[in-house]
């Protein structure tokens, strides 16, 4: 059976990267919440 997680750094960056987050209003909200919480890493 094929596993669900097939790692790819390119897909990871495109889907969860900083620029992907900044591209949408909801993504910017995620970054805002993570900054408020004091996360060391904001995105992938």
Swiss-Prot record:
Q: Keywords in alphabetical order, please.
A: Ribonucleoprotein, Ribosomal protein
One of the GO BP terms on file: translation
Database matches in PROSITE patterns: RIBOSOMAL_L34
Looking up InterPro entries in the UniProt record yields: Ribosomal_bL34, Ribosomal_bL34_CS
Q: Name one GO cellular component term.
A: ribonucleoprotein complex
Q: Which GO terms describe its molecular function?
A: structural constituent of ribosome
Does Transferase count among this protein's keywords? no
Among Pfam families, the record links this protein to:
Ribosomal_L34
Q: Which domain of life is it from?
A: Bacteria
Q: What does the sequence similarity comment in the record state about its family?
A: Belongs to the bacterial ribosomal protein bL34 family.
UniProt protein name? Large ribosomal subunit protein bL34
Q: Which species does the entry assign this protein to?
A: Rickettsia bellii (strain OSU 85-389)
Tell me the organism's taxonomic lineage: Bacteria, Pseudomonadati, Pseudomonadota, Alphaproteobacteria, Rickettsiales
Gene encoding the protein:
rpmH
């Amino acid at each position: 059976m094929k596993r669900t997680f097939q790692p790819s750094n390119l897909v990871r960056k495109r889907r969860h990267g900083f620029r992907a987050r900044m591209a949408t209003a909801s993504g910017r909200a995620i970054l805002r919440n993570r900054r408020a919480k004091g996360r060391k890493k904001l995105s992938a």
